[in-house]
Amino acid sequence: MADRALSRRERQRLETRSELVAAAHAIVKDEGYEALTIRKLAERVGMATMSVYSYFADKQAILTAVA
């Protein structure tokens, strides 16, 4: 099967997801697991709280991605 280039939308989605994971990692590292909330994560990256759920189902899914 031939590899295909990612569309601009797919690249943007991957970049946003990576940004969320990096921000979550920073929050956990600096403030601890209990300090990580969906709201705090959204504020850190400058997006609406509900938009985070487009990338992760819940806090556990974020932590799994961070690990």
Language-model region placement:
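Short, intrinsically disordered, charge-balanced linker/junction segments flanking boundaries
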Residues: 52, 60-67
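Short hydrophobic/aromatic patch on the recognition helix
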Residues: 45-56
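Basic, helix-initiating cap at the start of DNA-binding domains
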Residues: 1-31, 35-40, 44, 61-64
